[in-house]
Regions:
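A surface/extracellular/periplasmic glyco- and lipid-processing/surface-interacting theme
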Residues: 2-46, 51-230, 234, 239
């Protein structure tokens, strides 16, 4: 039978959290917020543009217990919420736009919309890539973190229903039971995009994501998709 991981399309492993609701978090991606923590352990990672031309990350996990520490946690936005709404994910962030707040009310999302980083904590001693820390040039918004332990406390204390059965995968993945379940991306539009660091799509499998100038380190991510939509600015967005 087809027993695929809801987030990756791969075969479910022996430790797959069957019947557990997926968990999504909002992570800051401003330059001063880097380096982030915990992103590499996510089963799925979204990067979407928000107001002002900046982007934010939304890592999504099959099992919140796998989160050692993640952050900096940032405020929620409706474009991310709309992605996870059909899956009724636990959505963790710190603060939210008025549009996001209205979406949560309209869809009666209740305790699944967590607005304090799941009792998140401040790491005032963190040092960013420029050597800045809180009280030494780093803004407070870059210091909020949470963990699987914190999330579990929130779920337990608030009696959040984490039971959810998924009958399909997040995307229409190629069936992992095929002999070669890898789509060839080399002829896609994105493969024609190049930078001084090389092609965006490499070997039909990996996409290079570039945020700033090259520092002789290249980051390659597997199972990556690019989705283009027409943005529409909204009034009333909060930081």
């Amino acid at each position: 039978p087809y027993e695929a991981n809801v987030l990756t399309g791969e075969a479910k492993g022996e430790n797959y959290p069957e019947g557990q609701r997926i968990t999504a978090l909002m992570v800051n991606n401003l330059v001063d917020a880097r380096p982030q923590r915990g992103l590499s352990k996510a089963q799925m990672l979204f990067e979407i543009k928000v107001e002002g031309g900046i982007t934010r990350f939304m890592p999504v996990f099959n099992d919140y217990h796998d989160i050692d520490e993640i952050g900096p946690i940032r405020s929620g936005r409706d474009q991310f919420f709309q992605l996870i709404l059909p899956w009724q994910a636990l959505y963790i962030h710190e603060g939210q736009s008025v549009v996001m707040q209205q979406y949560a009310l309209d869809y009666d999302y209740g305790l699944l919309n967590n607005n304090d980083g799941a009792s998140g904590y401040r790491d005032y001693n963190r040092v960013n890539w420029r050597g800045l820390s809180y009280g030494n040039g780093l803004a407070l918004e870059h210091t909020m973190y949470t963990s699987g332990e914190n999330i579990e406390k929130y779920i337990t204390n608030k009696n959040v229903d984490m039971n959810r059965t998924y009958n399909s995968t997040f995307f229409n993945f190629v069936d992992y039971r095929q002999d070669n379940p890898v789509r060839d991306l080399t002829q896609s539009q994105d493969s024609q995009l190049t930078t001084k660091d090389g092609p965006v799509v490499k070997d039909g499998e990996y996409v290079e994501i570039s945020h700033s100038q090259s520092y002789k380190t290249r980051f390659l991510y597997d199972n990556t998709c690019l989705l283009y939509t027409s943005p529409s600015p909204r009034d009333g967005l909060l930081s």
